[in-house]
């Protein structure tokens, strides 16, 4: 009988330590970085939550910058199904999708599409594109919004960052944040 009581006390102490103690410690540590702990949410100018800066969203209107293609989920951009397609780069499906995307962007031999705009990222939900890929789209976005292309290019530069600091050459832009900055103008 004594061993049962000791066992029950041990179970209760373990549950208390693991369920309450561990959870409280993790929650407390997360509060040191509250933005990240809450999913790195981005709010629009009107105060509504527009999305997360960590997950790509689908933008299809010409007035917005378009992210990399996504293979996550049936129609892409499904955060619950984040993954690449696992198809070979030599796959006929991948080649056909790349041709369709290049046509959508109006790519030509004189103006080839940056590869990242035709290929999904490994996780399928990469929220960033390179400044080069953003500049490729600047003309379309400016024309659709009725503003000067130089204004759009200046905003791209303003929104750009180097993810590795001085260790990286390529600058990136977050597509959601860039589109929200355009809407705020």
Where are these regions (language model features)?
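Extracytoplasmic/periplasmic C-terminal soluble domains
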Residues: 140-185
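A broad, structural surface signal
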Residues: 2, 6, 13-14, 180
